[in-house]
From Swiss-Prot:
Name of this chain's protein: Toll-like receptor 2
Phylogenetic lineage: Eukaryota, Metazoa, Chordata, Craniata, Vertebrata
One GO BP annotation of this record: innate immune response
Domain LRRCT: 525-579
Native species: Pan troglodytes
Gene: TLR2
Positions of disulphide bridges: C30-C36, C353-C382, C432-C454
């Protein structure tokens, strides 16, 4: 019994492992380029069976806890390995020994509490390494990165347990493009730990407290080009004179991101920035100012010249006591050399006139996503304000009048570029005043319905995209670039109004087509973006777009964004792939050809009808149909005549003087029906023929050469034949007045041929001695 239980347990384990392995394989997908993706697949281990064909492996967001020596042994060509957000707590020493080609390694946000230099020693090609978010306290007992000579981007540290930076941590690293250190809970920093790195393009430093900030600053000031401080509370920061003895600083840009600061500490920070002689750019992103704008220095403090700072950027600045914020006058003197200022989404509603006048070197001002209205803008753009300003961006403020906005900016004599997009202007006056040097105007997303002479004639670039325009008919002789996408235009603008146009972007309008002539009329056009319209793929449009090889050089979004909207059977297809049938593309020629063919067919039919008596056949067919439509007579018909005589008018002498005399004068006499004598006047001839045949016991046909030439004789023969077969009545009697060869009978007398082949006929004898027998036989035939 124990043995059986043991076997069952072993089998269960094997089956479980087999299912797990199968699940791992199913969660991994690889393409032909060796890019394998298995993220968020609930994997418990690295899938087996990985080969040298794998070049990129993404296993992020799984449940992998262990990496063994054999997991990646065969992946000798692996270039990128992403294992972020797993539960990895153990990596065997030689797990990466075969990854000499690996360039990108991401082990962030796992459970690695101890880092080993043996992991990274074989990774001679590594350029990117991310170790963020693992619960290690230090970066190991020995230098981890000394063998990574090609490393360019390094990210280390965590928010909670990484408390110590040692001098050996970054030994061997000489150049990095980006170094990110999450030292949020840093408690110990060994001097010169970061000084060993000779050059860092961008250093990102996460620090909750500022206690060790100055020590780190001393080490990096001569090696870092861009210093970024994140998540730091500088409310109580105090600057102390640095005893470094160094005057050369490499830092060109200093960024404060998600930093807390006060009026007093901001003054202290500025004293720190004074130590950076080469500082050109200062940036504050998502920061909080716990102050009211009181930046006055104490008697013992003095802010020295800010140096060469040219660019100031402030984004999403939060001021809790915004309603008490009152003064910037102490900073006026520090702004005279600044050339570029961006204050975005920070509730700015006014730039004091005095501050504007101090910004003498300002060339670029971006006040996007604020609260500016025309009245306050007029105060900001007062006389002598921003004398060097060339570019003004007031995107997404509260401007409502184009006319007032233009007049307000007249004081800015050097202004050339204005962006007032995403304001709600709705309408545009007929005329406006703008600075004389205006070259660029952005009116996109301003809800305007038309463009007028308010647009300055001096413009070289105009953006009116994402509005409600259905017509553009402005004469702008100097315009080189026109952005008019996402409107309601149905055709390209008139090229004669835009003689200098180089770039036209008119995508996502209501344009259905454009022609070669339209494009050729833009003599200087180099770039056209017209995709996203509902194109009618007519033959002319397709021929133009598919035959013009140079068109692809002009249409920058060709062919992906050019789709057919009609005809319906090609809707959604790319214009370059659509092929229409000959009938769709040459309809006029096809109709003309069909008409010609129909005319020839009618002509040929007429010739054939004339040659083969087709008209005669049609008349006969009509008579036949008329006869078929007549109501069927009852079997016991009202017989009025013994015989109806069908004969040619040229044989009337024989019929009237011989046949009639012989039969009607016989005792008992026969009553014959002759058309000359018995047809009812005023009645249709065909109806007379039909009625006479139906009222006669027999029908006598007097056959001769004259008979076969008579149309009416043919009708009488046809109706008699109809009676013969339709009523099963043997009523036809043939008299051959003169010999007729069957070959001489016309084709239209087909029924006569049939009757002569199936019935005996009486032949008029030339010998008078035999004529008595002829009359006897005829009388007998009529009586039968």
């Amino acid at each position: 019994m124990p043995h059986t239980l043991w076997m069952v347990w072993v089998l269960g384990v094997i089956i479980s492992l087999s299912k797990e392995e199968s699940s791992n394989q199913a969660s991994l997908s690889c393409d032909r380029n060796g890019i394998c993706k298995g993220s968020s697949g609930s994997l418990n281990s690295i899938p087996s069976g990985l080969t040298e064909a794998v070049k990129s492996l993404d296993l992020s967001n799984n449940r992998i806890t262990y990496i063994s020596n054999s997991d990646l042994q065969r992946c000798v060509n692996l270039q990128a390995l992403v294992l972020t957000s797993n539960g990895i707590n153990t990596i065997e020493e030689d797990s990466f020994s075969s990854l000499g080609s690996l360039e990108h390694l991401d082990l962030s946000y796992n459970y690695l509490s101890n880092l080993s230099s043996s992991w990274f020693k074989p990774l001679s090609s590594l350029t990117f390494l991310n170790l963020l978010g693992n619960p290690y306290k230090t970066l190991g007992e020995t230098s981890l990165f000394s063998h990574l000579t090609k490393l360019q981007i390094l990210r280390v540290g965590n928010m909670d347990t990484f408390t110590k930076i040692q001098r050996k941590d970054f030994a061997g690293l000489t150049f990095l493009e980006e170094l990110e250190i999450d030292a949020s809970d840093l408690q110990s920093y060994e001097p010169k730990s970061l000084k060993s790195i000779q050059n860092v393009s961008h250093l990102i430093l996460h620090m909750k407290q500022h206690i060790l900030l100055l020590e780190i600053f001393v080490d990096v000031t001569s090696s870092v080009e861009c210093l970024e401080l994140r998540d730091t509370d500088l409310d109580t920061f105090r600057f102390s004179e640095l005893s470094t003895g160094e005057t050369n600083s490499l830092i060109k840009k200093f960024t404060f991101r998600n930093v807390k600061i006060t009026d007093e500490s901001l003054f202290q920070v500025m004293k720190l920035l004074n130590q950076i002689s080469g500082l050109l750019e200062l940036e504050f992103d998502d920061c909080t100012l716990n102050g009211v704008g009181n930046f006055r220095a104490s008697d013992n403090d003095r802010v020295i010249d800010p140096g060469k700072v040219e660019t100031l950027t402030i984004r999403r600045l939060h001021i809790p006591r915004f309603y008490l914020f009152y003064d910037l006058s102490t900073l006026y003197s520090l702004t005279e050399r600044v050339k570029r200022i961006t204050v975005e989404n920070s509730k700015v509603f006014l730039v004091p006139c005095l501050l504007s006048q101090h910004l003498k070197s300002l060339e670029y001002l971006d006040l996007s996503e604020n609260l500016i209205v025309e009245e306050y803008l007029k105060n900001s753009a007062c006389e002598d304000a921003w004398p060097s300003l060339q570019t003004l961006i007031l995107r997404q403020n509260h401007l409502a009048s184009l006319e007032k906005t233009g007049e307000t900016l007249l004081t800015l004599k050097n202004l050339t570029n204005v962006d007032i997009s995403k304001n709600s202007f709705h309408s545009m006056p007929e005329t406006c005043q703008w600075p004389e040097k205006m070259k660029y105007l952005n009116l996109s997303s301003t809800r305007i319905h038309s463009v007028t002479g308010c647009i300055p004639k001096t413009l070289e670039i105009l953006d009116v995209s994402n509005n409600n325009l259905n017509l553009f008919s402005l004469n702008l002789p100097q315009l080189k670039e026109l952005y008019i996408s996402r409107n309601k235009l149905m055709t390209l603008p008139d090229a004669s109004l835009l003689p200098m146009l180089l770039v036209l972007k008119i995508s996502r309008n209501a344009i259905t087509t454009f022609s070669k002539e339209q494009l050729d009329s833009f003599h200087t056009l180099k770039t056209l973006e017209a995709g996203g319209n509902n194109f009618i793929c007519s033959c002319e449009f397709l021929s133009f777009t598919q035959e013009q090889q140079a068109l692809a050089k002009v249409l920058i979004d060709w062919p992906a964004n050019y789709l057919c909207d009609s005809p319906s059977h090609v809707r959604g297809q790319q214009v370059q792939d659509v092929r229409l049938s000959v009938s769709e593309c040459h309809r006029t020629a096809l109709v003309s050809g069909m008409c010609c063919a129909l005319f020839l067919l009618i002509l040929l039919t007429g010739v054939l009808c004339h040659r083969f008596h087709g008209l005669w056949y049609m008349k006969m067919m009509w008579a036949w149909l008329q006869a078929k439509r007549k109501p069927r007579k009852a079997p016991s018909r009202n017989i009025c005549y013994d015989a109806f005589v069908s004969y040619s008018e040229r044989d009337a002498y024989w019929v009237e003087n011989l046949m009639v005399q012989e039969l009607e004068n016989f005792n008992p006499p026969f009553k014959l029906c002759l058309h000359k004598r018995d047809f009812i006047p005023g009645k249709w001839i065909i109806d007379n023929i039909i009625d006479s045949i139906e009222k006669s016991h027999k029908t006598v046909f007097v056959l001769s050469e004259n008979f076969v030439k008579s149309e009416w004789c043919k009708y009488e023969l046809d109706f008699s034949h109809f009676r013969l077969f339709d009523e099963n009545n043997d009523a036809a009697i043939l008299i051959l007045l003169e010999p007729i060869e069957k070959k001489a009978i016309p084709q239209r007398f087909c029924k006569l041929r049939k009757i002569m082949n199936t019935k005996t006929y009486l032949e008029w004898p030339m010998d008078e001695a035999q004529r008595e027998g002829f009359w006897v036989n005829l009388r007998a035939a009529i009586k039968s």
